[in-house]
């Protein structure tokens, strides 16, 4: 045992269970919403590459999908368009949905007082 052995990674590829359950969640979510589009978010220093599904009303969900290839395959499997956020940006309806939810939460808090 070397001095730095405890810092080396052991084992094979990362477990697929998380990616599979994320893909299943995205497929279920897309099936239960109308007008769904996928937006690929780039990897950052904090997060892995993710895909955001946005419905016609702006409701959205985000999950990891196993890289850009996985995101594109998900789009093909679900028969939905796939966009790159770095090129297109987020859709306005997504921002509008977040703003509506923020206002609703604020009103709810005020009613509770």
Model segments located where?
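Intrinsic disorder
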Residues: 1-113
């Amino acid at each position: 045992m070397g001095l730095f052995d405890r810092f080396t990674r052991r084992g094979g590829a990362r477990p697929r269970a998380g990616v599979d359950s994320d893909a299943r969640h995205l497929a279920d979510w897309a099936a239960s919403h109308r007008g769904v589009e996928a937006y690929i978010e780039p990897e950052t220093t904090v997060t892995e590459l993710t895909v955001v599904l946005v419905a016609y009303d702006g409701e959205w969900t985000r999950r990891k999908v196993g890289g850009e290839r996985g995101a594109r395959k998900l789009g093909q499997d679900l028969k939905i368009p796939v966009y790159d956020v770095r090129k297109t940006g987020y859709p306005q309806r997504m921002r509008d949905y977040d703003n509506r939810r923020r206002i609703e939460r604020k009103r709810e808090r005020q009613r509770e007082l």
